[in-house]
Swiss-Prot record:
Family, as annotated: Belongs to the glycosyltransferase group 1 family.
Gene Ontology terms, MF aspect: glycosyltransferase activity
Origin superkingdom: Viruses
Enzyme Commission (EC) number: 2.4.-.-
Lineage: Viruses, Adnaviria, Zilligvirae, Taleaviricota, Tokiviricetes
Native source organism of the sequence: Sulfolobus islandicus filamentous virus (isolate Iceland/Hveragerdi)
Gene: SIFV0045
Top enzyme class: transferase
Alphabetized UniProt keyword annotations: Glycosyltransferase, Transferase
Protein name (Swiss-Prot/TrEMBL): Putative glycosyltransferase 45
Length: 351
C-alpha cells in the first residue's frame, strides 16, 4: 500500500445513524496552533453531518452569543472576555483547555466552579492531572481527546535538504521548548566533528544564542512549513512542558525519527515506546512565576542524555531510513490522528 492511499480519507456518514447537532464553535479564527485545531474540528464535525457555526472568541461577548444551538464549544477560553465576564447558558457548554505546566491556577479553577460549564475537554492526561494538582473541587467531568493531524500536510513535496537534517522547532517559549538545550547540543556535536545539518525554526532571527546556526523565521505558510518539515530526517525536541506538542506526532507521521523528552503530555500519544528516542528527566523545574493560569512545574531534560540520544539517532540514520519509516509506522500515526477519528471522539461527548 502506498502512503498516498491514506491521504484522502473521506468519511461518508450514514444519515440514519447520526443525531444531527447544531453546534456553536467559539474559537480563535487566526492561523495559530489552536486556530488550526479548531478548523480541523469544525471540518470533521461537518463531515460527520453536524451543523457548525464559528464565532471569534477574542472579540465576542457573553451577550453576543445567540441561543438556539445544542452545544457551545469554547475552544480555549483563558484570558478572553468570556473568561473574565462569563459565558451564557443557552445549551450544553463544553470548554476545551490546556495545561502547559503540571498545575492549573486557582484563578482558572474558579471559572469552572462558578460558570455554567457542563464538560471539560483536554488534549492529554497530563493536562487533566494539572486540574487536580491544587486539590480544589472541580464539578465537571474532564475528558481527554488528542489533537488531529492536518491531512493537507501529507500533500506537500519534501524540500531538498542536506542529510541528515536535524530539525528543532522553537517558534516561541524558548525555555519551555528547550531552546538552550538545542543550541548547546548542536554546537557541541558540530565541534566534535559530527556530520549533520542542524536547522532551527524560530520567530526571532535576532536571538543572539542562534549565532552560527542555521535558522528559518516562523511562522511559515503551511506548504513551506510542511515541505521543510518533511525534508528533514530527525526532530530534536527537548521540550520541558506543554499540553500536547503536536510536532512530535507530525514528525512521526512524516517519517522522521524523533528525539524527545520522556514523561510529558506528548509521551501519551506515542503508539509504540520504541518509536522515539527518549531523553531522561531527572527533576522538575519552575520557569514561570507570573502566569495567571499555568502555575506548576516543568520537566527538566537531562542535557547529557539529550546529547547522547541525538548521537544515537544520528548513528542509526541512513539514506533509506525515511522510506522505511514512511512505509511502516508513519501510516499508523496518520490513521490514529486522522481528523475524522478525532471528530468522532468529540461527537461521543457532545451527544
Amino acid at each position: 500500500m502506498e502512503i498516498k492511499d491514506l491521504q484522502c480519507n473521506i468519511f461518508i456518514p450514514d444519515p440514519l445513524s447520526i443525531k444531527h447537532m447544531k453546534i456553536a464553535l467559539v474559537r480563535d479564527l487566526t492561523n495559530n496552533s489552536f486556530g488550526r485545531q479548531a478548523t480541523l474540528l469544525e471540518k470533521g464535525l461537518k463531515e460527520l453531518g453536524h451543523e457548525v457555526t464559528s464565532f471569534e472568541k477574542n472579540s465576542i461577548r457573553k451577550e453576543d452569543l445567540p441561543p438556539g444551538f445544542d452545544d457551545y464549544i469554547y475552544y480555549t477560553i483563558f484570558n478572553t472576555q468570556l473568561f473574565w465576564k462569563g459565558i451564557p447558558k443557552h445549551g450544553k457548554n463544553i470548554v476545551f483547555e490546556v495545561a502547559d505546566t503540571d498545575a492549573i491556577s486557582s484563578v482558572a479553577l474558579y471559572f469552572f466552579r462558578h460558570q455554567p460549564v457542563d464538560k471539560i475537554i483536554v488534549p492529554s492526561q497530563w493536562s487533566k492531572n494539572a486540574f487536580y494538582t491544587l486539590k480544589l473541587p472541580i464539578p465537571q467531568p474532564i475528558y481527554v481527546i488528542p489533537h488531529a493531524l492536518n491531512p493537507s500536510m501529507f500533500s506537500y513535496p519534501p524540500k531538498e535538504m542536506p542529510h541528515p537534517c536535524v530539525l528543532a522547532i522553537l517558534p516561541h517559549s524558548w525555555d519551555r521548548k528547550g531552546g538552550d538545550i538545542v543550541v548547546n547540543v548542536f554546537r557541541e556535536l558540530m565541534n566534535s566533528g559530527y556530520h549533520f545539518y542542524p536547522l532551527i525554526l524560530v520567530s526571532n532571527m535576532l536571538e543572539p544564542r542562534l549565532r552560527g546556526l542555521n535558522a528559518v523565521k516562523t511562522p511559515l505558510p503551511d506548504p513551506d512549513y510542511y515541505s521543510l518539515f518533511a525534508g528533514c530526517d530527525i526532530l530534536f525536541y527537548p521540550v520541558r512542558g506543554g499540553a500536547f506538542e503536536i510536532p512530535v506526532i507530525e514528525a512521526l507521521a512524516l517519517g522522521l525519527d524523533v528525539v524527545v523528552t520522556e514523561k510529558g503530555a506528548w509521551s501519551e500519544w506515542i503508539l509504540n515506546n520504541d518509536d522515539v528516542y527518549w531523553i531522561k528527566v531527572n527533576k522538575k523545574v519552575k520557569l514561570w512565576y507570573t502566569n495567571l493560569f499555568h502555575v506548576g512545574y516543568f520537566l527538566e531534560p537531562d542535557y547529557n542524555d539529550a546529547y547522547q540520544k541525538l548521537v544515537m539517532a544520528l548513528a542509526n540514520w541512513h539514506p533509506e531510513k525515511k522510506k522505511e519509516n514512511l512505509e511502516n509506522r508513519a501510516i499508523l500515526y496518520r490513521e490514529r490522528y486522522n481528523y475524522i477519528n478525532i471528530a468522532k471522539e468529540w461527537e461521543k461527548i457532545l451527544a
